[in-house]
A protein has these predicted regions:
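Conserved acetyl-CoA pyrophosphate-binding loop and the N-cap/start of the following alpha-helix
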Residues: 86, 90-98
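A short beta-loop-alpha structural element at the N-terminal edge
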Residues: 1-13
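Conserved GNAT acetyl-CoA-binding A-motif
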Residues: 96, 103-115
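Active-site rim helix/loop that mediates acceptor-substrate recognition in acyltransferases
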Residues: 25-48, 58
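Glycine-rich acetyl-CoA-binding "A-motif" of GNAT/NAT acetyltransferases
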Residues: 51-55, 91, 121
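Conserved active-site alpha-helix within GNAT-family acetyltransferase domains
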Residues: 93, 105, 117-136
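Helix-loop element at the rim of GNAT/NAT acetyltransferase active sites that forms part
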Residues: 14-28
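Conserved beta-strand in the GNAT
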Residues: 46, 52-61, 76, 81
Length: 145
């Protein structure tokens, strides 16, 4: 079953998300998600099996420029995660479809995403789901003080 997450789900989401976004703590993510869930331009979907949360997806509407797109707003997959023991069952595809349907309902005609250059698993997932690669970048910074 897939359902839209509520503020009460923030900790459940964070417990999964910390496995994907390791530079943040579960507590930080739970607080961030509790606020983001309230935003009508964001949605979280939870996939459950036997009443256990086994995956989630986060999507947003982006009105700023999104690489390779021609419309606005654009539905954007911010993150998608399925617990290791539940992978290869089509759950990520189901979560992505929920996000895409939400974006369509919000008036979007395009849906986009990104991944780190080193995340080959995510790259293969996106391509298998019908995404077209539109750019590869490396970002730079330096101190000027």
């Amino acid at each position: 079953m897939i359902r839209i997450a509520t503020e009460k789900d923030s900790c459940i989401l964070a417990e999964m998300a910390v496995q994907m976004w390791e530079n943040q703590t579960a507590e930080e993510l739970a607080a961030e998600f509790a606020e983001t869930i309230k935003d009508e331009n964001s949605a979280f979907f939870i996939k459950s099996e036997n009443d256990t949360a086994v995956g989630f997806a986060q999507c947003n509407l982006r009105t700023d420029y999104v690489e390779g797109t021609e419309s606005s707003p654009v539905g954007y997959l911010e993150g998608i995660f399925v617990k290791e023991d539940y992978r290869s069952k089509g759950y990520a595809r189901e979560l992505l479809t929920a996000c895409e349907n939400w974006a369509k309902d919000m008036g979007c005609s395009e849906f986009a995403s990104d991944c780190e250059l080193s995340n080959t698993g995510s790259l293969y997932f996106h391509k298998a789901m019908g995404f077209d690669e539109v750019n590869r970048i490396i970002c730079f910074k330096k101190s000027i003080i």
